[in-house]
Design a protein with these regions (language model features):
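Acidic, surface-exposed loops and disordered segments
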Residues: 1-123
Length: 123
């Protein structure tokens, strides 16, 4: 992504500036946060992941773009304080919603995926 944006590996300031765009929801007009009760384990965390995937697919069907942002979990204390969430809640992620900027170079990125048969076995 950084190469696509013309940000050299050694330009730490530019890399940090790009990362910080997470915390502006990449300019999206709408966003939300997802919390999980601290007592919940991996099954409930995966439930939330499946819910988010479904939400993202439904948003796409409605002509909207989304970006799941795990980066927000690093800001748990700040977000929890601002939203006045309970002590039992832990921030899982944020998600921004809107229409992608077709002119933004970063939105042309299509990361390579390993072929299905290299990571999945069907029996």
């Amino acid at each position: 992504m950084y190469a696509l944006l013309g940000i050299p590996r050694e330009d730490k300031d530019a890399r940090i500036a790009q990362v910080m765009k997470n915390f502006e929801f990449f300019g999206a007009p709408c966003a939300f946060f997802c919390f999980v009760d601290r007592q919940m384990g991996p099954p409930q965390w995966s439930d939330l992941g499946m819910f988010l995937q479904t939400f993202m697919l439904l948003a796409q069907e409605a002509g909207l773009n989304t970006c799941a942002q795990e980066a927000w979990s690093m800001k748990h204390d700040s977000v929890s304080k601002f939203l006045q969430s309970g002590d039992e809640d832990i921030l899982f992620c944020g998600m921004c919603i809107g229409k992608k900027n077709e002119n933004a170079v970063v939105n042309s990125l299509n990361s390579e995926r390993r072929p299905l048969d290299t990571w999945a076995t069907f029996v």
